UniProtKB/Swiss-Prot annotation:
Keyword Hydrolase assigned: yes
Reactions it catalyzes: GTP + H2O = 7,8-dihydroneopterin 3'-triphosphate + formate + H(+)
GO biological process entries: tetrahydrofolate biosynthetic process
Any GO MF annotation of the entry: GTP cyclohydrolase I activity
Family (UniProt): Belongs to the GTP cyclohydrolase IV family.
Organism: Burkholderia mallei (strain ATCC 23344)
Gene behind this protein: folE2
UniProt protein name: GTP cyclohydrolase FolE2
Length: 266
């Protein structure tokens, strides 16, 4: 007899405390993945995964090794549809009725400088989350987009110049259909005073300086303009949108948030 089959399976025994656990699983598992770009190509990256399931009151433990096995078996680009399939597979493997998968990873866009045309990579922080509860599967895409903001008040009251700073626009969107990460990035960048690039030449610096000056926005303007774009996108059913300006003339940030669920009209 194989000794493995003769070993007791303690986690499968009955627990007498009768206390369900809402979420139990593994966290901070680093594992490679591929994602599909807006052009239909694939990009390889490394994800930090959190996977968990609901544990019934009478079950002592979950099958921890099966979470990692799920990552080992997974293949192909991680689209919204693939994420839903992965969630269903996890619940089947873990014999669970509810569960959650979250993966965070750096995503790179090869950007072209506005004047010189020089190419360079810019990184973005992306988190995909899938949640199954009460028979309902929900998928979320979250991306942090660094941009430039320039203060309208500073421009208005100054004889020349205006204070400007780097800002973060964070979009956390619940998806009804697959949305490429770059689509969310472009929405944030197009509504900012100016976008960022990894590498710029002097003609490019002149362009971005003047672009921001001609397009001043308060943090309130920034979050509202991005929200209007998200409202018009039928692939997005709900969102939490944040903007934070790291003020260059203060030792604090300016911050704004808009949260909306289109299904409730609010």
């Amino acid at each position: 007899m194989n000794p493995e089959f003769a070993m007791p399976d303690v986690q499968s025994t009955v627990d007498t405390r009768q206390m369900p656990i809402q979420r139990v699983g593994v966290r901070a598992v680093r594992h490679p993945l591929t994602v599909r770009t807006a052009e239909g190509e694939t990009q390889a990256t490394v994800g930090t995964w959190n996977l968990d399931v609901h544990l019934p009151a009478d079950q002592k433990g979950t099958h921890m090794s099966r979470f990692v096995a799920l990552l080992e078996e997974r293949g192909g680009p991680l689209t919204a549809d693939a994420f839903r399939t992965m969630l269903a597979t996890m619940l089947e493997k873990l014999e669970a009725r509810a569960g959650r998968i979250e993966v965070s990873f750096p995503y790179f866009v090869n950007k072209t400088a506005p004047v010189s045309g020089v190419r360079s990579l810019l990184d973005y922080e992306v988190t995909l989350t899938g949640d199954v509860r009460d028979g309902l599967t929900r998928v979320f895409a979250k991306v942090l987009v660094p941009v430039t903001s320039l203060c309208p008040c500073s421009k208005k009251i100054s004889q020349y110049g205006a204070h400007n700073q780097r800002s973060h626009v964070t979009i956390d969107a619940e998806l009804a259909a697959d949305v490429p990460v770059e689509d969310l990035i472009r929405i944030a960048e197009e509504e900012a005073s100016c976008e960022l690039w990894g590498l710029l030449k002097r003609p490019d610096e002149k362009f971005v300086t003047e672009r921001a000056y001609e397009n001043p926005k308060f943090v309130e303007d920034l979050v509202r303009d991005v929200a209007r774009r998200l409202d018009a996108d039928e692939r997005i059913v709900a969102y939490v949108l944040e903007a934070e300006n790291f003020e260059s003339i203060h030792n604090h940030s300016a911050y704004a948030l808009i949260e909306r669920d289109k299904r409730r009209g609010a």
